[in-house]
Amino acid sequence: MLYKGDTLYLDWLEDGIAELVFDAPGSVNKLDTATVASLGQALEVLEKQHDLKGLLLRSNKAAFIVGADITEFLSLFLVPEEQLSQWLHFANSVFNRLEDLPVPTLAAVNGYALGGGCECVLATDYRLATPDLRIGLPETKLGIMPGFGGSVRLPRMLGADSALEIIAAGKDVGAEHALKIGLVDGVVKQEKLIEGAIAVLRQAITGDLDWRAKRQPKLEPLKLSKIEAAMSFTIAKGMVAQTAGKHYPAPMTAVKTIEAAARFGREEALNLENKSFVPLAHTNEARALVGIFLNDQYVKGKAKKLTKDIETPKQAAVLGAGIMGGGIAYQSAWKGVPVIMKDINDKSLNLGMTEAAKLLNKQLERGKIGGLKLAGVISTIHPTLDYAGFDRVDVVVEAVVENPKVKKAVLAETEQKVRPETVLASNTSTIPIGELASALERPENFCGMHFFNPVHRMPLVEIIRGEKSSDETIAKVVAWASKMGKTPIVVNDCPGFFVNRVLFPYFAGFSQLLRDGADFRKVDKVMEKQFGWPMGPAYLLDVVGIDTAHHAQAVMAAGFPQRMQKEYRDAIDALFDASRFGQKNGLGFWRYKEDSKGKPKKEEDAAVDDLLASVSQPKRDFSDDEIIARMMIPMINEVVRCLEEGIIASPAEADMALVYGLGFPPFHGGAFRWLDTQGSAKYLDMAQQYQHLGPLYEVPEGLRDKARHNEPYYPPVEPARPVGSLKTA
């Protein structure tokens, strides 16, 4: 053994070839600060070996290196800019030493090589991969850019266009694509990987392969003419501006850095990368996006822990077909859980099957599946008008009309047709689970399972624990949701649960703005362009359905009369009374017509202004800040109340439910991350300016207490240790 660290070791392999093996404790390798330091120490040993002829890098895990240790990021991002820059210089000196070894080097890459793992293998001369490879640079999705030379080496290896596509979009690619663009030099089966790697190294050692020529382009300026450079970077900047926008600075910074570094060799280019990375790491956007990544890991880890002793359901059923039922049936079947889809009439069943078939055909058109796979999946969805087969069902989700009487009747009837241990769930969006459970003989086997529309796209499923729901019931439904590829978050029961409970105060803020003379078009524009929502409130109401919102608004008002009971007729009432239900019937705040792809396209409709005039004061202008404050304060206050009341268990789960269920702008990180970024005291000062607007604008006492003590909702993060300590970690 030449060297042994905590996460990697160095040893002779055979005949002058050494192997550097990443083998961290635990299930995966991460390129954390300690591993970077250890890699430097291993290279120091290697540089003294006069008999060295070649170096093989490999992993002892199922994945090569999954990336940097994201859990270190928030503390690293708090290090002063100069110290962070120094540490990056140190880390890059390690990868430069790997790249500058006087012998050929090869990385044998299996599984994932992402972020820092990808940047590590870019420093070698050759790369062999297994068919399960996923390699790429996802840093821009975390609000930063590659910092270990990825923005320097990748363009010089692949050319500007392919590299920009990967870096700006934060993409990873599979083995076949990586081979096609030159990111890897060959793809071999796992059992042949080491044998193949040694064979390539031997060819390089004997001179049959020119490893020096392979290495040289990575050390030089990017080979692009002025015209080629202008075309590549102009197109890339245009696409990034269109897709990322002003709220996500990392992709544009990465493109501009690659452009600026194109005319320099490695050292100067790395300096430019460093100068771009450090300011990005100190942005609120980076902290928010890293926070989302960590919260996502926390939420999924919690679901995994909850279901560790639970068998995933083998047979499911959906009550109620149509678009929602068909979407749930598709998602279950697509992920491998057969499903019975029951309805009371053929028309609805046909609609549900058509929806499932349409979604499968889209997968076929995109090349994700073949005809046999499509036929196999669709055959596991069994439409029926009766309860045949329900005696073998493990879990049933009810998705009938949002009417408590109908839901109770359907659930009570179904309970008599299934085994005693079968779990029942309701896809209700607002009706309390306790109310629906009152119709059942076994309420302990019942809970809520709230999907979001469209089911196949929306990642969140709210799992609602009723007062009598058993732990096993919750675990079974969480297991099914996880199997469907969803992110389940368990919440406690109340009207609207978590997501809709906090959404309707937001809509109430919108209604009050319109009542006071705001133009809904400007409100939408501000909330989309300035705050960052994917849809403004008027457009969102049209998509949800004005009739749906009108009904849910009444349910919420009954559940929380002290805050959500209206004392005036609002815009939702006016549109509902005029049968303007939104996209579903082509008339809402906007008029809708289908475009060439059959998708609804919104158009101005002057008639709506006359309609809204009956429930509004004369039009007046509001500042962007005032619109944002009046829209967001009711939502934020209700989110805080949900945490204080135990409806949601943690800030992390609340923020992920908002991001995954409502599209809360990820660059804000969620409501609690947004609060922490602003500071509770600053938020309180803002909110108090609007408390005259009513109970929805009254800040909860717990938030006031946070402001008094200057406390964040997330645990405070300490800056990483000084750079000197990081080097020798």
UniProtKB/Swiss-Prot annotation:
UniProt xrefs under Pfam families? 3HCDH, 3HCDH_N, ECH_1
Question: What does UniProt give as GO cellular component?
Answer: fatty acid beta-oxidation multienzyme complex
Q: Which residues bind NAD(+)?
A: M324, D343, V400, V401, E402, K407, S429, N453
One BP annotation, GO: fatty acid beta-oxidation
Task: Please provide, alphabetically and separated by semicolons, the GO molecular function terms listed in this UniProt record.
Answer: 3-hydroxybutyryl-CoA epimerase activity; delta(3)-delta(2)-enoyl-CoA isomerase activity; enoyl-CoA hydratase activity; long-chain-3-hydroxyacyl-CoA dehydrogenase activity; NAD+ binding
Q: What does the subunit comment say?
A: Heterotetramer of two alpha chains (FadB) and two beta chains (FadA).
Q: What does this protein do?
A: Involved in the aerobic and anaerobic degradation of long-chain fatty acids via beta-oxidation cycle. Catalyzes the formation of 3-oxoacyl-CoA from enoyl-CoA via L-3-hydroxyacyl-CoA. It can also use D-3-hydroxyacyl-CoA and cis-3-enoyl-CoA as substrate.
What is this protein called in UniProt?
Answer: Fatty acid oxidation complex subunit alpha
Organism name: Salmonella agona (strain SL483)
